[in-house]
């Protein structure tokens, strides 16, 4: 499991296990409070639907949804019904081991996409034009990820 820790603006230490609804909520809070992300992602418009394939300690498929818009995260949902979000801008699919490797910095997200360890459905042109936003999103996610057990 991934143990997540970070300090909020008020100095409160929070922790959650990846993957969990609590982790996803902490990611939302961090995305909405990170000034660097807000600046870099100010022109991004696109929601993300993640499919995490079971592997290792994850025994069943997992999904989560993020609505990212102009440097903010407007909504997150853990284990959403895919029918509620029939046409997200991007669908990202990866095995549990590959997604945790990206979250811990062991696997570069661009390398993961190019080698199909992280599969992306949606406008690759848009994503490639917005590589700084993609990389900073990953940076924020990595900052809330402190260790893998």
Please tell me what each predicted stretch does:
Residues 4-149:
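Feature captures hydrophobic
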């Amino acid at each position: 499991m991934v143990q997540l820790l970070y300090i909020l603006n008020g100095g409160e230490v929070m922790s959650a296990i990846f993957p969990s609804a609590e982790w996803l909520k902490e990611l939302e809070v961090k995305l909405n409070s990170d000034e660097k992300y807000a600046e870099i992602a100010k022109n991004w418009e696109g929601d993300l639907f993640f499919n995490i394939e079971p592997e290792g300690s994850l025994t069943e498929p997992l999904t989560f949804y993020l609505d990212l818009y102009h440097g903010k995260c407007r909504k997150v949902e853990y284990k959403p019904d895919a029918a509620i979000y029939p046409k997200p801008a991007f669908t990202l699919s990866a095995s549990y081991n590959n997604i945790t490797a990206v979250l811990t910095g062991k696997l570069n997200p661009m390398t993961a996409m190019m080698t199909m360890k992280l599969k992306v459905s949606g406008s690759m042109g848009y994503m490639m034009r917005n590589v700084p936003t993609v990389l900073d999103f990953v940076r924020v996610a990595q900052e809330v990820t402190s260790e893998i057990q």
